[in-house]
Regions:
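Extended non-catalytic scaffold regions that mediate assembly and binding
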Residues: 40, 211-213, 222, 229, ...
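Generic detector of bulky aromatic hydrophobic side chains
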Residues: 127-128, 206-207, 279, 432, ...
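Intrinsically disordered, low-complexity regulatory regions
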Residues: 312-563
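Conserved small-residue
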Residues: 1-198, 364-376, 530-561
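Intrinsic-disorder/low-complexity loop/linker signature
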Residues: 41-42, 94, 230, 291, ...
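Basic, glycine-/proline-tolerant helical and adjacent loop/strand elements
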Residues: 158-324
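Sequence-level detector for tyrosine residue identity
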Residues: 21, 60, 68, 74, ...
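Poly-acidic low-complexity segments
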Residues: 142, 224, 504-505
Length: 563
């Protein structure tokens, strides 16, 4: 049988295609047999036999629970139950019991919420021990109870919640109102009139059954067209193949209520059931990063599109690690995946973002080609990789993620000098921070070389200035009779030099440099003359010199030995 072919389209359809792939991948459909991409990597193909025999409702629900389940209220309830049980099992002290007071309140409050009540009502006759849930409502678990009773009630509740139908129902209640409704609304289980209805039945009626019926039917005599994929659809007044696109947030008004925008007030902007199902999968195509959903619309090939937005793998295996990930970090991490595909010509990449509130709209960013060229540079990738292994530094009472800050500067076309300045000042008190300052400085110099195409001379001059700073350091410390790694006597000098650099005060900076060289009897390097006429050189040479003066060679011994 001819396979079902899904071609790329706008960003929403592309997100739906990624969502389809993620769903099939997570549920372990057979890639290469049940679904595949064509040789040109432009079309997602699905076996018609697989599609006609598949339970599209079951797949939809299971995929959402697997991918978004770890981030749901349900999982937090399970985590808190296990925490409370652990505290009680260790001993029955008042202090220990009081430490779980807030956790017990969280558990009972969430279990008594309106969404959980309506979900329970739909599955009450299909699960075991429904009285356990009803007991939560009538007699809440609290710290005033005996420890044995708390432990017994929590164990019963945990076993109750771990029933597959309970897990699915309670997870989906959270997923629907926290994730899915950010993208579509007013249809199926998100229609107000269906709030208390069985979620699976509503989805089957509005999405899965129309899809199956559509795939089974011949459309040789159909007269209507899907506005998304141009496929033929029945356009009769009673046809269930005409799906208004208005259920997608921010895409169109309700076409049944507002037809004045169409010729002769005849609405003809409908999508087919297959595209409607793809749109329902859009939340699986976007990736939740911090407090935003993000999607990279790389449409040069399906492999690039799928790999850069592969939600299932990341969330299932690394959810805890990436739950608070920032946008800039996500960009760098996903682009690394794209660069590994070795796409011959990678142009500007549109990135679509949407907030996690229902009323938030779509915003569009562009990762321009010049930024992509920087991020895929081997040396830049090497510096970022090193920063990612130990990204956080403590500066006074605050923590700074150097890795995220440096990427954010790159994608926003900001230089790194403010960050370098902050790190050098912090390294005066905490020596270990200096290595991060060196990496960020190397990244700034490399970025300049890539953007301006000035390679060998720039790098050579910067190394020379760093070595000059290091030689001056050795001379000053030797004159004072101080050990090479003990530089307390230089802290004030380094602090004043970084201040002068940060405000671009060349006169003050050079005054301090001349004083230092006069007292050390060393010759002032020629680089200081060059930097007076060029603001970029002032920063490059100035920070290279200070890093050398601080005791960190811009070039490590290993690099020198390797030529």
């Amino acid at each position: 049988m001819e396979p079902i072919k899904i071609t790329k389209g706008d960003f929403l359809k592309n997100a739906g295609i990624v969502g389809m792939y993620n769903m099939l991948h997570v549920l372990k459909a057979r890639e290469g047999e049940d679904f595949w991409t064509d040789e040109e990597e432009q079309v997602l193909c699905i076996s018609r036999e697989f599609a006609l025999n598949a339970d599209w409702t079951d797949m939809y629900f299971k995929a959402f629970v697997e991918i978004y389940g770890p981030m749901c209220t349900y999982q937090e309830i399970i985590n808190r139950i296990e925490k409370c049980k652990g505290v009680i099992e260790k001993g029955d002290g008042k202090e220990k019991k009081s430490s779980i007071k807030d956790d017990l309140k969280y558990i009972t409050d969430k279990m008594s919420s309106s969404s959980y009540k309506s979900g329970f009502a739909n599955i009450r006759d299909k699960i075991e021990n429904p009285e356990i849930y009803e007991n939560i409502k009538s007699r809440k678990i609290n710290v005033k109870m005996e420890s044995d009773e708390i432990l017994k009630r929590l164990s019963e509740l945990e076993n109750f919640l771990k029933q597959p139908l309970c897990r699915e129902t309670f997870c989906m209640k959270s997923i629907i109102y926290n994730y899915i409704n950010c993208f579509w609304n007013g249809k199926s289980f998100l229609h107000k009139a269906n709030a208390t209805e069985d979620m699976r039945e509503m989805f089957e009626k509005d999405f899965s059954k129309p899809l199956k019926d559509y795939l089974l039917k011949s459309h040789e005599k159909s007269m209507g067209y899907c506005i998304e994929c141009n496929a033929l659809i029945d356009d009769g007044s009673r046809s269930n193949e005409k799906v208004p696109i208005s259920f997608m947030n921010d895409m169109a008004d309700d076409l049944d209520k507002k037809s004045s925008a169409f010729w002769n007030c005849k609405v003809d902007a409908y999508i087919c059931p297959l595209c409607a199902y793809l749109y329902a999968l859009v939340p699986l195509g976007f990736r939740l990063v911090g407090n935003k959903f993000v999607f990279q619309n790389i449409d040069c090939s399906l492999n690039a599109l799928i790999n850069s937005n592969e939600t299932g793998k990341v969330v299932l295996e690394e959810n805890a690690r990436h739950s608070e990930e920032k946008y800039a970090t996500w960009v760098a991490r996903t682009l690394n995946t794209v660069f590994k595909l070795k796409i011959r010509e990678l142009n500007n990449i549109p990135v679509i973002l949407r907030g996690t509130n229902e009323k938030d709209g779509y915003t569009f960013n562009i990762l321009h080609k010049d930024i992509l060229n920087i991020l895929k540079d081997k040396k830049i990738m090497e510096y970022l990789e090193k920063l990612s292994k130990d990204p956080n530094v403590k500066i006074k009472n605050d923590f700074l993620n150097v890795y995220e800050s440096s990427i954010e500067n790159l994608i926003n076309y900001n230089n790194q000098y403010r960050l370098i300045n902050r790190l050098i000042k912090a390294s005066i008190e905490t020596e270990s921070i200096l290595s991060r300052a060196v990496l960020v400085f190397k990244m700034q110099v490399r970025t300049f070389i890539i953007m301006r195409g000035k390679g060998e001379n720039t790098e050579m001059n910067v190394k020379s200035m760093a070595n000059s700073g290091y030689k001056l350091r050795k001379a000053i410390l030797a004159a004072k009779g101080v050990e090479p790694d003990a530089d307390e006597c230089m802290r004030g000098t380094i602090y004043r030099l970084t201040n002068a650099l940060s405000v671009g005060n060349t006169e003050r900076f050079m005054d301090m440099i001349i004083r230092l060289y006069t007292s050390s009897r060393l010759d002032v390097p020629n680089g200081f003359i060059d930097m007076l006429q060029d603001r970029e050189k002032f920063n490059q040479y100035g920070y290279a010199f200070i890093l050398g003066l601080k005791g960190s060679h811009y070039v490590s011994k290993e690099e020198n030995e390797n030529g």
